Amino acid sequence: LRRSSAASDVYKRQGELQKDDVDFFIIETMSSIDEAVNAVEALSNFNKKILICFCLSEGDGTKLFSGEDLSKACDLIQIDKISGLCLNCSQFEDISIGLDILKKYGLPFGALPNNFQSVKPLKLGMSVDNIKKRNDILIEDFVNYSNIWLKKGCTILGGCCEITPDYINGLNQFLMKNKYNKVNFFN
């Protein structure tokens, strides 16, 4: 692993600025093992719970965006310092595979998919402004995927890029209709 003092310093500074105003830290869109390890190490000394979210390689729900194994990332992040594991800003299909890996760690886990056609065109420093939204994932599809993920044991559900408030509202209506209890996943 490459420990990056520059990256660690950035995460520590962010933690220092937020620690008095937050209940817990969410570390999102971790695309490599180094990135995740540096973030967890930097934030674990603030006496706050940590939810970490990994970004998956498009087309392979077992790999991070960097190409490294998701299971190896979970093994190396000091899992005892983590309160929950998620997959975010990734394709629905990849998340469905990756959740089976997260489940093995015995922590609350979840999914926050994006609704992009593809992020493969992205290069370092580019914005997602030019990425197109998928046309094949409607609100009811989001709800159906979420139901599958609930059956896998997910306790954290939400959305990332291009998952609009209408999608979240559709999910909320489904959860209420089916009498799912909202729980604080840190209890």
Predicted regions and their residues:
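Single conserved hydrophobic/aromatic residue that forms the stacking wall/gate
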Residues: 1-7, 11
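A cross-domain feature marking catalytic cores of carbohydrate-active enzymes
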Residues: 29, 52-56, 87-89, 113-115, ...
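Conserved beta-alpha-beta core of the PfkB/ribokinase-like small-molecule kinase fold
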Residues: 36, 43, 49-68, 120
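Aromatic/hydrophobic pocket-lining residues that form the small-molecule binding cavity
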Residues: 9-12, 36, 70, 95, ...
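Active-site-adjacent beta->alpha loops and helix N-cap segments on the catalytic face
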Residues: 30-47, 91-106, 163-171
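A structural motif
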Residues: 19-24, 30, 82, 151-154
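Catalytic-face loop-and-helix region of soluble metabolic enzyme cores
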Residues: 61-62, 69-156, 174, 178-180, ...
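An active-site-proximal structural segment forming one wall of the substrate-binding cleft
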Residues: 9-20, 24, 142, 149
